[in-house]
Amino acid sequence: MIGITKLISIWNAIWNFLLLPEIIISQTDTSSTGIYQMQSKVRSLVPVLTERSDYFSYYRVNLYRSSCPLWENDNAMCSNQGCAVKSLNEIEIPKVWKKLSDFEPHSKKNDTKCNWKYNPDLDYCYLDNSTSPDEYVYVSLVQNPERFTGYAGDHSAAIWRSIYEQNCFVVDDDDNPSEQPKSNALFRPNQIPLNLFTENHDDTSLSPSVACLEKRMFNRIISGFHASISTHVCQNYYDVEEQRWTQNLDWWRAKVGSFPDRIENIFFNYALLHQALVQIATQMKNITSDSSFTFCPTDKDVDWRTHTAFEQLVYHAYQDRHVINREQFFADEEAKRFKDSFRKHFRDISRIMDCVGCDKCRLWGKVQITGYGTALKLLLEPETQLSDLRPEEVVALVNTFDRISHSVEATFWFSLKAKTNDTLDAIKALIYKTYRSPSKEILAFFIDQTWYLFYALFFICNVPRVI
């Protein structure tokens, strides 16, 4: 007879097989399970802002800037209908955004009528500071969702290659970006970039000047940003043959799912943005009623509803406030020496977004890079206050958090489906190896019919970890 110990071992083996593997996220104090649980707490709060609030569901952006820092003549524009962005006319612009235009950082009225202030020295991205309203467009982020557009090929690859090459750091006090010639990338020709999507996490093979904590964080943010976008595209994929929007599991596995480091970096980016919201919550707790933070709308009722929804989001995030220890970054003198270089290179990525040939991709690229830049400003610049952020930065931060939240949720569902497919493929391979025709074909057919049964089994076993 089988002993109790043997039965327990068998049960543990079966149980471990049914569970999705837990990922310990380096440079954080959490895991994939912790991220799933944090996500479940704010899942219903984020859409209140990003879909129903005029303040957070709209965005003002210089979308059609003519200059591109990568190449002089850029005619590789996406002609697909899915690449187009629907902008707002003057009548459609929400009142809250019309009012915000009166409180630009360059406006003297900002000092007395609104508590928004602006310090460009702390920026981790280029913000649109033009005083000409003709250079901006207002867009509804709800009406222009991030999804598959068909924009791909050599031009898209060149954009990503240029972004990856920004992880070349040089500690040079005389390094002036304005004096660097405009070439095919915003880096010096003799700088050799690292491969952000390397499958080897062992930094011991790198020189000490390269294998520092901050450079790895830079790499992970860009890697997670790319993996998150790929996940959104796979989650909202247009099947040309069937003429419908669907999910593309095979493409997700090829782009993201087959690379554990990319999945981990999605979770890392969630942790980074979550910690930025915690930082905001910490500051809001210290704001007195006499100098309360407002969103500067014309309608006090709208202001109250927006403030309440935003406050609920950041305070729920505050419940899990020890996710990333921001004091670990730029802690020693060597790291502090290239902090300006770190900021400059991340800022250059926001300029690369002007070269994207797809309008909708450019829009969401600008929004999300601004969101990550805002998170870095809050976490890496201790003097940054909530009142130092521009409205576009706060909106970008919340919408980027919404995007990474969708990526985390989609990663869970894609992983369940991938595990179901792998299990059935393994069973069918065993059948084909054990039985002969026609028995093996018949058995394999019946196994295919159990897909939803296995999927439900994996779901039941794993869903308590994400609730």
Curated annotation (Swiss-Prot):
Entry superkingdom: Eukaryota
Entry PTM: N-glycosylated.
Record-linked Pfam families: ERO1 (PF04137)
UniProt entry tagged with the keyword Membrane: yes
UniProt keyword Oxidoreductase present: yes
Residues annotated as binding FAD: 147, 149, 160, 223, 226, 255
InterPro entries: Ero1 (IPR007266), ERO1-like_sf (IPR037192)
GO biological process: protein folding in endoplasmic reticulum
Function summary: Essential oxidoreductase that oxidizes proteins in the endoplasmic reticulum to produce disulfide bonds. Acts by oxidizing directly pdi1 isomerase through a direct disulfide exchange. Does not act as a direct oxidant of folding substrate, but relies on pdi1 to transfer oxidizing equivalent. Does not oxidize all pdi related proteins, suggesting that it can discriminate between pdi1 and related proteins. Its reoxidation probably involves electron transfer to molecular oxygen via FAD. Acts independently of glutathione.
Protein name (database record): ERO1-like protein 1
